[in-house]
Swiss-Prot record:
It holds the Pfam family CbiQ. The lineage of its organism: Bacteria, Bacillati, Bacillota, Clostridia, Eubacteriales. It is a multi-pass membrane protein. It comes from Ruminiclostridium cellulolyticum (strain ATCC 35319 / DSM 5812 / JCM 6584 / H10) (Clostridium cellulolyticum). Transmembrane (T) component of an energy-coupling factor (ECF) ABC-transporter complex. Unlike classic ABC transporters this ECF transporter provides the energy necessary to transport a number of different substrates. It comes from the Bacteria. This is Energy-coupling factor transporter transmembrane protein EcfT. The chain crosses the membrane at residues 26-46, 73-93, 116-136, 151-171, 247-267. One of its GO terms (cellular component) is plasma membrane. The gene is ecfT. Forms a stable energy-coupling factor (ECF) transporter complex composed of 2 membrane-embedded substrate-binding proteins (S component), 2 ATP-binding proteins (A component) and 2 transmembrane proteins (T component). May be able to interact with more than 1 S component at a time.
Length: 267
């Protein structure tokens, strides 16, 4: 389960999506997320799924690797789906005592699952195809207008990127701790859900210690390289919008607008 969490990892590649300006990818990711919540019909979700599938294929990221990142949220999807199926009132399909399954509940559960899967894949594609440095530069550039009101834009962008980058690092450390404790007789697989959750408590203390140690090492390394924030800093690679970025943004906006018009005007 721990190794199945792939969001935050960068997958080296030479696809057009890897070469695209990181600002374009961030903007399109937010646009996609907004439209995921605006769509409320199955044919709309079908179109968004096809669009997402085309994006995944064009990124040259292995489909199995992308689907692997969905495994950690399966429990959340199933749990929330069961609650929706039994709690939402409507046309009863099946009932037993005080429990009843409704058509509306099933409908909401399916749509919620589709939304969560699309959101995770969309957010993951951003980190799969963008290096942490490029992501930091892009966030700082997009938030640049806030500098006029004395907002520490560079520091905010740096913290966001480091936090995102630490996800796979901490997950890898968690996996190592679990394996080390398992070799000493710890059991994380037997018992009910509550017992399994309790068995992970001994993992938390060494994990927190490791996290603080890694954070201290990172701070020391940054100071050793004379890092002093954004003042006077230059970039090895300057961000530039290309025709490809304009083309991709235009196609995405036109496609999403068409889907919304079909959703709210024609249907």
């Amino acid at each position: 389960m721990i190794r199945d969490i792939t969001i935050g990892q960068y997958v080296p590649g030479n696809s057009l999506l890897h070469k695209a300006d990181p600002r374009t990818k961030i903007i399109l990711t937010f646009i996609m997320m907004i439209f995921i919540f605006l769509i409320n019909t199955y044919w709309g979700y079908l179109l968004l799924t096809l669009f997402t599938a085309i994006t995944v294929v064009s990124s040259n990221i292995p489909v199995k690797f992308v689907l692997k990142g969905l495994k950690p949220i399966l429990f959340i999807v199933v749990f929330a789906g069961i609650i929706n199926i039994f709690m939402i009132k409507g046309t009863v399909i099946w009932s037993w005592g005080f429990l009843s399954i409704t058509y509306e509940g099933i409908n909401v559960a399916i749509k919620m699952a589709i939304r969560l899967f699309l959101l995770i894949i969309t957010a993951s594609l951003l980190t799969y195809t963008t290096t942490p440095i490029a992501l930091t530069d892009a966030i700082e550039n997009l938030l640049a207008p806030l500098k006029r009101i004395k907002v520490p834009v560079h520091e905010i962008a740096m913290m966001m990127t480091i936090a995102l980058r630490f996800i796979p690092t901490l997950l890898d450390e968690t996996d190592k701790i679990i394996k080390a404790q398992s070799s000493r007789g710890a059991d994380f697989d037997s018992g009910n859900m509550i017992e399994r959750a309790k068995s992970f408590i001994p993992v938390l203390i060494p994990l927190f210690i490791s996290a603080f140690r890694r954070a201290d090492e990172l701070a020391t390394a940054m100071e050793a390289r004379c890092y002093r924030g954004s003042e006077g800093r230059t970039r090895m690679k300057q961000l530039r919008f290309t025709r490809f970025d304009v083309l991709v943004t235009g196609i995405t906006v036109v496609f999403m607008t068409w889907v919304i018009l079909m959703e709210y005007v024609f249907f």
